[in-house]
Amino acid sequence: MKKKKLLIDVNSIVPYYVSGKVNGIGRTTLELLQALADIDNLPFEIELYSQNMKGIGGRNTGLHFECSHFYLPHREKWNKILTKFPIREWFTGYDIMHIPHNFEYVHCPEKCIVTLHDALFIHIREKAFSHEKMKEIVPPFINQCKHIITCSEYSKRDIVETMKVDPQKISVIYWGVKHEIFFPMQVSKEILVNELPFPLRNTGYFLSVSCNNERKRTNVLVESYLQYSECASPVNDLVLVWSNPPEELTEKISYSKVKDHIHFLSNISDKQLSLLYNGATALFFPSMFEGFGLPLLEGMACGTPIVTCRNSSLDEIGGEVVFYLSDPIDKSIIEMLKMFDTDSVDCRQKVEAGIKRASLFTWERTAEQTVEVYNSCLTDSIRKIC
């Protein structure tokens, strides 16, 4: 009997092979693909699907899956055209398609599994991510699709409540950690100086792994550090993996007395990121909303003390092994900076518990649970052209 075919849309990983940069969704999609490739004797066939004019897609992964590529622009206009006719269905002959990036224009949503990472666009409008448009198109789409995967119990509840989706239609599958990269290690100053592109002082540093989204509140962290420096001389520098900080913030830093203590980094490899986690006095992640919170998990796996917020999925992932900020957030950050700066906090128990907690999250487990969803959906699917 011929195996059924699962088609995975891999368009979210294309930027990685173009520029070496990828967002959180692209990164987790790539990790899932690599973990799926390590599973022997899958009861179905996997094929990777991509669409762009450069010819970049599944073949670039080097994985053993079959690959299909459409030489069409991956733009809304063209994707809407593809919904009019069963072109993907004819071309690939898939039984079920997995869309791991929240939404896609498709001809037959009833044959789709969608990974909806969160319902952020319902609560917070970020123009750069077309959240107004997503609020309009995503809810009807996911109500039509065959099944939904999301990455936290919080996100599941939020999707059910805000988009009126049947909870039986949603599977929670946590993301994982690459434990072969993110693990506790002894990191000397010499190693950090040789591996990292910033001038490290003789003291330690606080770390932030974030981006320019306002909800991440990375700007609040920087402002709090500047405010703290007005009444104390920080022992720890502030290192931010943040490629595009706003000009008004960098200008404000340039006039401060701690301008040489604040470092912005970009294009960091996973190996360098692991070193940063391991060398940090603490990781600060003051986000106001997350569907998961991967930096928390990576930091825990490296034995880094974590400071974050008790909101959205963050306390679900952090549990009782992290330090939580309170409102007002800026004052709470300053208090935490002071506590770690003056060595007045004992974090050994939380660090040890964090390493143990992070060990429960693996990409192998993520892939195995995803395969269970694939199997369930393929078992009751009827191969037909919509």
Please tell me what each predicted stretch does.
Residues 1-386:
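Carbohydrate transferase catalytic cores enriched for Leloir-type hexosyltransferases
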